[in-house]
Regions:
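Helix-rich terminal scaffold detector
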Residues: 1-21, 31-34, 43, 117-154
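Conserved, well-structured core segments that form or line functional sites
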Residues: 87-137, 141
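Aromatic-residue detector
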Residues: 53-56, 112, 121, 153
């Protein structure tokens, strides 16, 4: 088992050729928000990941093992609800209103210019449909917002 205890956000400082050569690991959001987990990379190696508590792993980040090997993180497709304005009489403002209501419920949400994504929840799906939004379930990568107090800079 390879022990991983370092993370390079978005592969910062690494040459593109190194990123291209690195093994990859696909992780869903449930795993990526944990600081300790096991996974298997694209080369079949078992990874024991031990990051500082509170660390969130994002697609595009690079995990660095104790032996110096690198593993590129990919956000694995998972079940998500994709929310879009009604094609007949909706507007982009409808997404703003939906994001407001979802935020009031502390729902993790991925914001895009033309859609929102959340993890499946039939109660929320019904609420959004009642707001005249289109809600469909699909398989896609999920990268929710970090929130107002998430680490990171401009």
């Amino acid at each position: 088992m390879l022990t991983v205890n370092k993370l390079l956000p978005q592969g910062q400082g690494l040459a593109p050729v190194l990123l291209k050569r690195a093994a990859a690991v696909q992780l869903d959001w449930d795993v990526r928000q944990k600081s300790r987990f096991d996974a298997v990379d694209s080369q079949g190696r078992t990874l024991g990941v031990f990051l500082p508590r509170g660390t969130v792993v994002r697609g595009g980040d690079v995990l660095v093992a104790e032996d110096g090997s690198m593993v590129r993180v990919e956000a694995a497709p998972q079940n998500v609800l994709v929310i879009t304005p009604c094609s007949e009489h909706g507007s982009p403002f409808d997404l703003t209103r939906a994001a407001y209501h979802l935020g009031n419920r502390h729902v993790q949400i991925e914001l895009q210019a033309d859609h929102l994504k959340i993890e499946p929840d039939h109660v929320l799906a019904d609420m959004l449909r009642a707001m005249h939004l289109t809600v469909r379930e699909t398989q896609a990568a999920f990268e929710p917002e970090g929130g107002a107090y998430a680490a990171g800079g401009h």
